[in-house]
Amino acid sequence: IVTREFFEQDILRSYQALAPYGITLRNAPFFMPPYEHYNATIAEWANSMGLILVNFTSGTASNADYTTPSMKNYRSSDNILQTILQKEESEGLNGHLMLFHAGTSPERTDKFYTTHLHTLILELRQRGYRFVPLTKAIR
């Protein structure tokens, strides 16, 4: 639905906005398309710009942290945490990429990143996991 020119300009504007914080294409080359929707064309455009297309690993429900109680697909933070831990118990999480949103609707009062993320990190560390930068995980 977008042209290559629009796509490239949008990416470049994003990096310009992030530059004051030291974030550059060189040190943060990862691209997760909005809503995780992409096709071969978007993948090729991203690759030609030096971007590495990534997506979260399905099955943990981590990405549901944006949902609100009024949505049919709503998942509470307790439910998300339990789903992740159950996935870890049944299959393990080595190599999994989880998506947590940095901000959510005011309608969602149990924000995973403020109420459960710390607990998840501590629990996974206790279970022997270590967290590494994405650059080390996929290269």
State the predicted function of each range.
Residues 1-99, 103-125, 129-130, 135-139:
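Catalytic domains of cell-wall/extracellular-matrix polysaccharide-remodeling enzymes
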